Amino acid sequence: MVYVFSILELISFLIPILLSVAFLTLVERKVLGYMQFRNGPNVVGPFGLLQPFADGMKVFIKEELKPVNSSPYLFFFSPLLFLALALLLWNFMPVHTPTLDLQLSLLLVLGLSSLSVYAILGSGWASNSKYSLLGAIRAVAQTISYEISLALILLSLIIFSSSFNLTYIMNTQEFSWFSLSCLPLFYIWFVSTLAETNRAPFDLTEGESEIVSGYNVEYAGGPFVLFFIAEYANIILMNYFSVVLFLGGPSPLNNLFPISIIIVGIKTTFLFSVLWVRAAYPRFRYDQLMFLTWKSYLPLSIGALCAILALVALLGISLPLF
């Protein structure tokens, strides 16, 4: 019976994530349609609400193709690893579901998120295609480059809040959000999350005019869907992660409603901002993408970290201990 309840808890935790991924695709197409003065999907179901399910059925009934000279085990294992890491990261988020509230949850999120580059690189190499390999190398270089700025910003927030625990960091913002006191870091964090999740205008891994579809160009059917679900689950995760770190704090409506209305509203605004950026800005060149993080964001992140260390030393705030 214990195993049955554990399985039910896991299902109740995963189904909302998968449904949110499905409807995020619909919202994205609707937003892009309205910003381009056209209607989005509006045929399948009322207001097009059944369009994600129709797309899912169409993709899953497609044949799973495998290149002749590919590495079969790594070729099919990479999408599974990518999706598993994306869903595993949700276990450390402070949501109203059975999650892991660990003392070093922030470090675990940072470490596990960096492991996704192995799945991307494995898929590009196992496909035995030059376009897949070039897309994978681009994605890995981009992810690693922007993770440095993200890690420095996280270190600044850890020092500022004196804790590695996500729940504690969220609760320390009860009277003032970190986005107000650390506004430049908040801006750098938002742009870096776009690059980290390979979203426009930093979607260089999917440059259609250069490398076709990037590291997943040889995937079709089920394995492609696993990559797709993992990418959009990471987008939702990074948006919620941003809300917890910079716009956290208990809502005054928590006693009236079962969920925090303020956090849900801000998270929805964040998601709309990500979609709006895709519709408004063209794709960067790859050299501009690299120069942005190494010549702009990295020096600013290091300077902000030094400033916060000096402020902590002046105010006598205790540094976090393991």
Curated annotation (Swiss-Prot):
Regions that span the bilayer: 4-24, 73-93, 106-126, 150-170, 175-195, 224-244, 257-277, 302-322
E.C. designation(s): 7.1.1.2
GO annotation terms (biological process): aerobic respiration
Keyword Cell membrane: no
Record keywords: Electron transport, Membrane, Mitochondrion, Mitochondrion inner membrane, NAD, Respiratory chain, Translocase, Transmembrane, Transmembrane helix, Transport, Ubiquinone
GO molecular function, one term: NADH dehydrogenase (ubiquinone) activity
Topology with respect to the bilayer: Multi-pass membrane protein
Catalytic activity: a ubiquinone + NADH + 5 H(+)(in) = a ubiquinol + NAD(+) + 4 H(+)(out)
PROSITE patterns for the chain: COMPLEX1_ND1_1, COMPLEX1_ND1_2
Top-level division of the source organism's lineage: Eukaryota
Pfam families per UniProt: NADHdh
Cell location: Mitochondrion inner membrane
InterPro entries: NADH_UbQ_OxRdtase_su1/FPO, NADH_UbQ_OxRdtase_su1_CS
Main location as per UniProt: mitochondrion
Enzyme category, top tier: translocase
Record's GO cellular component terms: mitochondrial inner membrane; respiratory chain complex I
Function statement: Core subunit of the mitochondrial membrane respiratory chain NADH dehydrogenase (Complex I) that is believed to belong to the minimal assembly required for catalysis. Complex I functions in the transfer of electrons from NADH to the respiratory chain. The immediate electron acceptor for the enzyme is believed to be ubiquinone.
Family affiliation: Belongs to the complex I subunit 1 family.
Descriptive protein name: NADH-ubiquinone oxidoreductase chain 1
Species of the source: Strongylocentrotus purpuratus
Chain's gene name: ND1
